[in-house]
Amino acid sequence: MLGSVTDFLKPRLVDIEQVSPTHAKVTLEPLERGFGHTLGNALRRILLSSMPGCAVTEVEIDGVLHEYSSKEGVQEDILEILLNLKGIAVKLEGKDEVTLSLTKSGTGPVTAGDITHGDEVEIVNPEHVICHLTGANAEISMRLKVQRGRGYVPASARVHNDDEERPIGRLLLDSAFSPIVRIAYNVEAARVEQRTDLDKLVIDMETNGTLDPEEAIRRSATILAEQLEAFVDLRDVSVPEKKEEKPEFDPILLRPVDDLELTVRSANCLKAEAIHYIGDLVQRTEVELLKTPNLGKKSLTEIKDVLASRGLSLGMRLENWPPASIADE
């Protein structure tokens, strides 16, 4: 039912089509005429420029002093190897910077799966080829620095005045931290009752696998909303002083379970049990979770490990849960 002519229609999430684990189409309708392009372009720009991610920022290759050289027994030159290193899709858990190593010998391809790393690192595309070794005695050894960041940062932006102390052979890479591989939007016609001049926004997006497309849309919309809050009340543009109040609950307990980045199976099992927040989850016991349909011991172990990495555990008691801020949702 349409309201007053001055009322704005509020869009609703119509469909999320998961084409693949890294490719999704999100449809929103109805939108007032013109708002399809307004919101679509804003979200597209935020997705391209402001999504956090991880990338290789520095590399040292044994026997290589600069990028304009080659290495015996390696098919690619160093510049091509550096380009291939940029294509590694990596996730860091609980750290903002790590140093990884890679050593391989013998004929054949060298892939991202050959990188040695700890449990806090996940290589999402282990099949990604870095270079090819062309002889039985060929060998390559390198150390990679992976950092967390946002957007695109050229190597020149990380060069400082004290950079003369940087060892010869440590090569800096232009880093594309954004997990968004491709983003496009299309505005189609929509209809509500007798109105045919409305917009339908279709966002088509691919990621490198380190960030779920649905979560990327959610984060970009949150960033946009936070930036627009300043325009809601223009009378008070000063930043209010923050009162040092001890929060009733640890902020991590108020975050959705999606932030734990569990496997799809585990996440779906929790949602089926109406476990939407981390605070809901930590109050459950192991016995209670094992009674959840389709949630086995492997999923339980995964949940316990992820909680432990954040200093949490199952079976916790939370007084006055849920807080009013989420109880009304």
Swiss-Prot record:
Entry keywords, A to Z: DNA-directed RNA polymerase, Nucleotidyltransferase, Transcription, Transferase
GO biological process, one term: DNA-templated transcription
Entry-linked Gene3D superfamilies: 5' to 3' exonuclease, C-terminal subdomain, DNA-directed RNA polymerase, insert domain, RNA polymerase, RBP11-like subunit
Any Gene Ontology CC annotation: cytoplasm
Lineage: superkingdom: Bacteria
Transmembrane segments: none
Pfam families given in the database record: RNA_pol_A_bac, RNA_pol_A_CTD, RNA_pol_L
Database matches in InterPro entries: DNA-dir_RNA_pol_insert, DNA-dir_RNA_pol_RpoA/D/Rpb3, DNA-dir_RpoA, RBP11-like, RNAP_asu_C, RNApol_insert_sf
Catalytic EC class: transferase
HAMAP family (UniProt xref): RNApol_bact_RpoA
SUBUNIT field: Homodimer. The RNAP catalytic core consists of 2 alpha, 1 beta, 1 beta' and 1 omega subunit. When a sigma factor is associated with the core the holoenzyme is formed, which can initiate transcription.
Domain notes: The N-terminal domain is essential for RNAP assembly and basal transcription, whereas the C-terminal domain is involved in interaction with transcriptional regulators and with upstream promoter elements.
Annotated protein name in UniProt: DNA-directed RNA polymerase subunit alpha
Species assigned in the record: Aeromonas hydrophila subsp. hydrophila (strain ATCC 7966 / DSM 30187 / BCRC 13018 / CCUG 14551 / JCM 1027 / KCTC 2358 / NCIMB 9240 / NCTC 8049)
Species classification: Bacteria, Pseudomonadati, Pseudomonadota, Gammaproteobacteria, Aeromonadales
